[in-house]
Amino acid sequence: MKVLVINCGSSSLKYQLFDMTDESVLCKGLVERIGIEGSKLTHKVNGEKLVVEEPMKDHTEAINHVFDALLDEKYGVIKSLDEVSAIGHRVLHGGDKLTESCIIDDKVKDKIREFIKFGPLHNPANLMGIEACEKLAPGKKNIAVFDTAFHQTMPAKTFMYAIPYEYYEDYRLRKFGFHGTSHRYITLRTQQLLGKEDINIITVHLGNGSSIAAVKNGKCYDTSMGLTPLEGLLMGTRSGDLDPTVMTFLMNEKGYSADEMNQILNKKSGVLGVSGISSDFRDLEEEAEKGNDRAQLALDMFIERVKRYIGGYMAELGHVDAICFAGGIGENSSSMRKDILDTFEELGVKLDLEKNNTREEALISADDSKVKVYVVPTNEELMIARDTLELAK
């Protein structure tokens, strides 16, 4: 069985086609600048690539070009769309109503629309991708896999906000959490590595967007992101946790609207805002080595925030089997992992510095560490493909 996985952004689209007999990737690609001048599709297969530069005014035209690439005489990997058993879609926000992956129908689409208020950039784009596939491949099963789903096992004491309770009842204002597909993949893989299902672990997904989850007995117990992906850790451009009065002060002092304030906190803050240089952690490490104090400050603030969450989740869980690093930074930066965990020895977490020097899946803790530490490269697309295969049977 072949499964197509699609991840739609507001002006971009990523895709991968899987052969689920061995979970291999047959091809993958990216469509950029949808609805903007300079639309481009880059399709990769067997180390070769096909580049298509044509106007693509919407997601339907973009997905039509994706289908053409899949069927291309030279760069294609299928002879007919009939070979694709189902299409899996990453959907940002399912709220507390769509708590697991599901076959998409009109009711599901209505619920995705309902949560546009909490995912105004992503949910509309996710819907456009779904509706384009329904139009271009009628009769094909479309499956939704939600970023929020894994976290819906959190108890009320970890997902509620301490604001008047009627705001929760009237507007569902609560923590939902994100990167759930990644945290679920890491959890399932760590269950295999530890040889048991009832595991207590801390999953640390660090990239330009970052989040941490506390997993208790194999289920999400708490997570750092909140109602939206803005809460929690410092990120590339997101502020993370912040005294809300900072916002009201700036709105009063500078005359910012709520939308402008949202833009500042989501797009101009985080390590970019602190450093004034870049949202890319590699750039900051380079600048810090040259003696740039603000670059170093941004990195230090990021590390301290990660430490705070890991330490807090260790207290919440009581017993911790493992801490698992994933994401672009979590998987690739041995120095970041070392700096994050260098104060945890008293809590039973000890790195083996030689083993830590890796970018592959590995156990990187010392033999005498009470808590195991792993690098577990995440694979959200494969997780979506697996769910799609299961539901499409």
From Swiss-Prot:
Active site annotation, chain numbering: D147
GO cellular component: a single term: cytoplasm
Localisation per UniProt entry: Cytoplasm
EC supergroup of this enzyme: transferase
PROSITE patterns: ACETATE_KINASE_1 (PS01075), ACETATE_KINASE_2 (PS01076)
Swiss-Prot/TrEMBL site (Transition state stabilizer) positions: H179, R238
GO molecular function: acetate kinase activity; ATP binding; magnesium ion binding
Catalytic activity: acetate + ATP = acetyl phosphate + ADP
Listed InterPro entries: Ac/propionate_kinase, Aliphatic_acid_kin_short-chain, Aliphatic_acid_kinase_CS, ATPase_NBD
Alphabetized UniProt keyword annotations: ATP-binding, Cytoplasm, Kinase, Magnesium, Metal-binding, Nucleotide-binding, Transferase
UniProt binding sites for ATP: K14, H205, L206, G207, N208, G209, D280, F281, R282, G328, I329, G330, E331, N332
Residues reported to bind Mg(2+): N7, E380
Entry-linked CDD domains: ASKHA_NBD_AcK_PK
Cofactor note: Mg(2+). Can also accept Mn(2+).
Binding site for substrate: R90
Pathway of action: Metabolic intermediate biosynthesis; acetyl-CoA biosynthesis; acetyl-CoA from acetate: step 1/2
HAMAP family linked: Acetate_kinase
Role summary: Catalyzes the formation of acetyl phosphate from acetate and ATP. Can also catalyze the reverse reaction.
UniProt similarity note: Belongs to the acetokinase family.
Summary of subunit composition and partner proteins: Homodimer.
Protein name: Acetate kinase
Organism: Finegoldia magna (strain ATCC 29328 / DSM 20472 / WAL 2508) (Peptostreptococcus magnus)
Name of the gene encoding the protein in the UniProt record: ackA
